[in-house]
Amino acid sequence: MTAVRAARVVVVGAGVVGLLTALECALAGHRVTVLDRGTIPDPGSSSYDQHRAIRTLVPGDPEGTRRMVAAHRRWRELETVLGTAFYRRVGVVTAWPPDRVAAVVASAAEAGVEVTRLDPAGLPHLGFPAGATGVRETRAGVLLARRVLRAAARWLAAHPAVVLRPHCAVTAVDPRSGRVELAGGEVLSADLVLVAAGPWGRELVGRPVVLHRQTMLYLRPPDRLARWWRTAPAAGGLGADGRAWAVPPGGGTLLKISSDAVCREVAAADCADEDQAPWAERLALAGVLPDVGRYTVVAARACHYTTDAETGGAQLARLGPAVWARAACGGTGFASAPLVAGRIVDAVTEVAA
Ligand SMILES: Cc1cc2nc3c(=O)[nH]c(=O)nc-3n(C[C@H](O)[C@H](O)[C@H](O)COP(=O)(O)OP(=O)(O)OC[C@H]3O[C@@H](n4cnc5c(N)ncnc54)[C@H](O)[C@@H]3O)c2cc1C
């Protein structure tokens, strides 16, 4: 058996991908430096939200489903590693047109993912498209995202092989040499570099991506519905056009709704000057919550993600012998973070062998 030495790893970006990768590398015996231009965690990162949904079924994609089952398993274990409860396994319901349901259920059965059909009348406070059928995935639910980030940052700060460097903006990463340049002129080198700078990564990684901005609305349910929402699942395929989703409140969070209909392509991941009110209004009228007028609107916020310009997906790419990047961060970018972390640990282990 080949002995593995402790390698030096530099992670650029302390969102969920950077933090989990640092954690897994430290657990594997490597030395890790995490750089972020903001605090760690950074409230401006795209991971820093109340919650993110996790599900395992990728209809029609058994390999993708197998990977998400592995990610789900790792999230459960991470609750123990980090000593923090952050997963609300409330299930995820997706609304499907009747002619698609049989294929989705068959796809789940083939992949060994447990689902049940559901009459939308059983979830009267969620707005389903006319005629839709619900499919409920039980091995799914809500990750309390901020809680994950804070727990991971605490764990890393206490680990002797990890150095956290907040307020360190990276200005360039050379894919061939692996040199990492910081604002101020400092240069770092490592056996492996991961660029996990979220929507801002495109400034460091020269790969074509499409930048998207999406507005989310945070609401407090009326008192009389608080009990109902306590056990409600996350849900997708909602609203009159079937493009909206809802993440239920719980664990100290608010109800959140959004829709692909308010997702737009933008040129820059900075929306400080953009008025969110018109987008919030569209969301409120999307039919996600049948009695939306009874809910208290607490906030509207925009968040960014990127998709690969060719495939439309998120992507982990090897840019050079020792440089990797989460080149695009869209879709299931939070839930799938353990998969990126696992792949990087494998790559570091190869380098260190
Ligand atoms: C509206 C919306 C809803 C979503 N819902 C879900 C969901 O339900 N489930 C799911 O799985 N995913 C979801 N996602 C996707 C998910 O949130 C992201 O894919 C994921 O959080 C990205 O994490 P990250 O670590 O790659 O990037 P980020 O969390 O954005 O972290 C990047 C970090 O890099 C730092 N940084 C940037 N540039 C530099 C630099 N030059 N130098 C140093 N540091 C730098 C930033 O400060 C930041 O802290 C959603 C995304 C959006 C926008």
Language-model regions: role of each:
Residues Q50-L126, G131, R243-A244:
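Dinucleotide-binding Rossmann-like beta1-alpha1 core, especially the glycine-rich loop
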Residues L27-S47:
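Glycine-rich FAD pyrophosphate-binding loop
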Residues T171-V187:
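Conserved beta-strand-loop-beta-strand element in the redox core of flavoprotein oxidoreductases
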Residues R8-V34:
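N-terminal Rossmann-like FAD-binding beta1-loop-alpha1 element of flavoenzymes
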